[in-house]
């Protein structure tokens, strides 16, 4: 008897659902795309408990005919293509006929729909893929579909869902992308009775950007437009001054379909050339109009990825369009006087909101402890070791190349460093390569030193260096009794700063400096959700945020170790970094924050120091617990002992040299 048999439709749909319906956000995406294909002008998304209880999508589109409503839930039933030729020129969001049967196979679905001119509509109810009820029902034009009891018959799938907050974040993100891709459609998104997002649907993309990323971001967007024989590129990109810590703020659409394409994302970044800081990315919304023949959308189960013809041509067009637009823009940031001189209504509104946010509100005292102004090249003195703070901060980080002993400087671990960083996507802080010596590599080790290592290190302390001069505004030349030292000034101050900040950030101190005017921070809905999840983590490093509206937070004070004049930037950098790397413990965040602060506050390459500043740097370096490496593991110094120097100048030669014995020492 044969073993092969055909699967029944319900089981086949459940298998297909494993690829198409991964989580509640997948349901939202598929249902909203169906609404867009139905020429809807308005789409309302209503979600309960992050989609775990219910997802409801209401539109004013074409609706479904009564005779088609049952067929719509059959696998591979679609109105969008009729032949294989249509598959190569698809212009609709959906076309496979998989979404509705896949959703119905793993949930409880109720759909009510009506077409224009009909006196009544039709309602259908399915559960687990089985049709339960089909009957006439009162309905306005469009479709109203509600999905409940998701994965009731596949409980194992529930185990792979993230927390409700994470699932809500993913739903919000996909709605934002769909709204950016379709500015002519009015979207609204409500969760647990609270409206989280609304767009006007007036085809003004810049307004949609402002609704998602904030009004200030919307004002700093540049409109772009470019075309060639095959492609037309349009949209908005942010000024170089407006950046984020990840690429997640870049949205690319093809014929108003949101896609993910790493090469096109790189093209957007390339268009900025050197105008972006390392590790920072723009906000961008780019739509590409092209002949459907040039794109294959049938290469991914969820259609998030596509295959493009003439991709290199498109990459060049995107990069050049952005490059030309930025080239004609005045990139000197303007001071917005309005933000410093608010009108009376704004002052009254701010005062009212402050009082509502906190029952007890007092203006910041004028006698608040001021932060000390320090020059860019002034180095904080490391404080006494505190094992409790060190333990609280140490965490697992990629194993750096660490030099524990003085003699290791004679055989530095530069070769290992080169091997690690030569393929990294991000460049090192300097364009010039660091000199290398390759006698023998030093094995990577953990940043923490055990007791034995610390005892050994005390016996091999960093030498007291006598300053000689500076090379290329980047390296300090110094000498000691055992030879020449070349010190990377950025890495040296980064190490000094790191040990200072690690101590300060590790302290949970009551010493806070009040802002004279509380700082109001605005974020997108997705970012605000992430911040709400990590308020305790931020409080642990001295940033106590309070909710101040839907996507806004208020910060009344900051740690006293913030540098004067940079308080707002420092707070925003720390919050932005947490948004990008949300999956961190408090200990890890403290460690990473200390590293970030030490790097940003260190002197850079091509910065010329006077003799006093250089000597101060060399004097404080030996006071560090580990003066041999920066926090990222890069060597601080390279050492040439006397023997190395003499060999370089042939003042001594190897014993195997045939003529070495023919010369007396005094001849050299």
Swiss-Prot record:
Keywords (A to Z) from UniProt: DNA damage, DNA repair
UniProt-listed GO biological process terms: mismatch repair
Domain of life from the UniProt record: Bacteria
Residue spans crossing the bilayer: none
GO terms, molecular function: ATP binding; ATP hydrolysis activity; ATP-dependent DNA damage sensor activity; mismatched DNA binding
Family the UniProt entry places it in: Belongs to the DNA mismatch repair MutL/HexB family.
Name the UniProt record assigns to this protein: DNA mismatch repair protein MutL
The organism of origin for this protein: Limosilactobacillus reuteri (strain DSM 20016) (Lactobacillus reuteri)
């Amino acid at each position: 008897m044969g073993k092969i048999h055909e699967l029944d439709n319900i089981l086949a749909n459940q298998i297909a659902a494993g690829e198409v319906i991964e989580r509640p956000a997948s349901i939202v995406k598929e249902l909203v795309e169906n609404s867009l294909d139905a020429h809807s002008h308005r789409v309302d998304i209503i979600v309960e408990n992050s989609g775990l209880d219910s997802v409801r999508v209401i539109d004013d589109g074409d609706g479904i005919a009564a005779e088609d409503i049952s067929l719509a839930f059959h696998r591979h039933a679609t109105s969008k293509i009729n032949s294989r030729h249509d598959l190569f020129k698809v212009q609709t969001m959906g076309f496979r006929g998989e979404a509705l049967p896949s959703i119905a196979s793993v949930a409880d679905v109720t759909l009510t729909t009506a077409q224009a001119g009909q006196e009544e509509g039709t309602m259908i109810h399915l559960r687990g893929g089985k049709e339960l009820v089909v009957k006439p029902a009162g309905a306005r034009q469009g479709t109203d579909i509600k999905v409940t009891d998701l994965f009731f018959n596949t409980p194992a799938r529930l185990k792979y869902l993230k927390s409700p907050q994470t699932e809500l974040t993913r739903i919000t993100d996909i709605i934002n992308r769909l709204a950016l891709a379709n500015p002519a459609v009015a979207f609204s998104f409500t969760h647990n009775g609270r409206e989280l997002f609304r767009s006007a649907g007036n085809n003004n993309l810049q307004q949609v950007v402002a609704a998602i990323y904030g009004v200030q971001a919307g004002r700093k967007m540049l409109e772009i437009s470019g075309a060639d024989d095959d492609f037309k590129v349009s949209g908005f990109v942010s000024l170089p001054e407006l950046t984020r810590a990840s690429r997640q703020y870049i949205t690319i659409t093809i014929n108003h379909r949101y896609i993910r394409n790493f090469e096109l994302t790189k093209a957007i970044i390339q268009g900025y050339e050197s105008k972006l800081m390392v590790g920072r990315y723009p906000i961008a919304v780019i739509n590409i109009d092209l002949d459907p023949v040039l794109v294959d959308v049938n290469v991914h189960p969820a259609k998030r990825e596509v295959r493009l013809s003439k991709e290199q041509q498109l990459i060049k067009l995107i990069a050049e369009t952005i490059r030309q637009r930025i080239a004609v823009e005045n990139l000197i940031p303007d001071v917005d006087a309005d933000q410093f001189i608010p009108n009376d209504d704004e002052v009254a509104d701010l005062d009212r909101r402050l009082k509502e946010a906190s029952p007890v509100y007092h203006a910041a005292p004028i006698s608040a402890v001021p932060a000390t102004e320090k020059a860019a090249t002034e180095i904080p003195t490391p404080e006494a070791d505190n094992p409790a703070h060190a333990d609280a901060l140490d965490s697992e980080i990629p194993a750096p190349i660490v030099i524990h002993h003085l003699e290791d400087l004679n055989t530095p671990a530069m070769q290992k460093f080169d091997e690690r960083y030569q393929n990294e996507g991000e460049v090192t802080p300097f364009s010039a390569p660091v000199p290398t010596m390759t006698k023998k590599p030093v094995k990577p080790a953990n940043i923490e030193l055990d007791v034995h290592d610390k005892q050994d290190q005390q016996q091999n302390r960093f030498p007291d260096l006598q300053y000689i001069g500076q090379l290329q505004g980047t390296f300090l030349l110094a000498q000691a009794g055992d030879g020449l030292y070349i010190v990377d000034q950025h890495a040296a101050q980064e190490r000094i700063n790191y040990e200072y900040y690690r101590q300060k950030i590790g302290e949970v101190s009551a010493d806070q400096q009040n802002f004279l005017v509380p700082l109001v921070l605005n974020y997108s809905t997705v970012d605000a959700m992430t911040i709400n999840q990590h308020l305790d983590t931020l409080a642990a490093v001295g940033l106590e945020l309070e909710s101040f509206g839907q996507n806004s937070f208020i910060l009344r004070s900051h740690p006293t170790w913030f540098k004067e004049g940079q308080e707002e930037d420092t707070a925003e950098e720390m919050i932005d970094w947490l948004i990008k790397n949300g999956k961190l413990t408090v200990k890890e965040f403290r460690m990473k924050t200390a590293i970030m602060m030490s790097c940003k506050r260190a002197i850079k390459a091509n910065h010329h120091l006077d003799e006093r500043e250089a000597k101060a740097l060399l004097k404080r370096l030996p006071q560090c617990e580990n003066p041999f490496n920066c926090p990222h593991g890069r060597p601080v110094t390279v050492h040439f002992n006397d023997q190395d120097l003499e060999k370089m100048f042939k003042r001594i030669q190897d014993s195997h040299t045939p003529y070495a014995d023919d010369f007396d020492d005094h001849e050299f």
